[in-house]
Amino acid sequence: MKDKLELVPVSLKEANEFVRRYHRHHKPVTGHKFSVAAAVNGEIVGVAIVGRPVSRYLDDGWTLEVNRLCTDGTRNACSFLYSACWRCAKNMGYKKLITYILKEENGASLKASGWKCIGEAGGERWTGKRRPEVDLYPAQMKLKFEIE
């Protein structure tokens, strides 16, 4: 089949460049445990960047977080990447993988790949000393999803 999605390795630099070009509301990340890409006919159509959980309370050594997932809109690329991320994390010995989406998003690709919605998470904005002067991301509640 000519237009089949394929999993391909990708460097953090390449994944971040894809995020810079295509992500609706996030910027590239500074580090990762691994990144993967989805390709069709050798052309990258989506990337996922997986790292340690942003929340230090969830950073237990057994949990990773999909920090960025971004596609060009290719059908089924999101669920393909979420499934691939879980297979990779599980094969590395991790017990849980988490991610967050905006509350306005429906999570269909996560549900299609076996993830469960845990509920609302976080606040609308950053708080504390690290809060940027200008909001870097949409001021909305997030939904937390996980798979184990």
Indicate residue ranges for each PLM-predicted region.
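Charged phosphate-binding loop/patch that engages nucleotide di/tri-phosphates or the phosphate backbone
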Residues: Q140-E148
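Short amphipathic alpha-helix that is part of the acyltransferase structural core
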Residues: M1-V29
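A residue-level signal for beta-strand positions that form part of recognition/binding surfaces
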Residues: K4, T63, K142
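Acyl-donor binding region in acyl/amide transferases
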Residues: P9, K33, A39-V40, G51-A139
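Short glycine-/small-residue motifs
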Residues: G46-V47
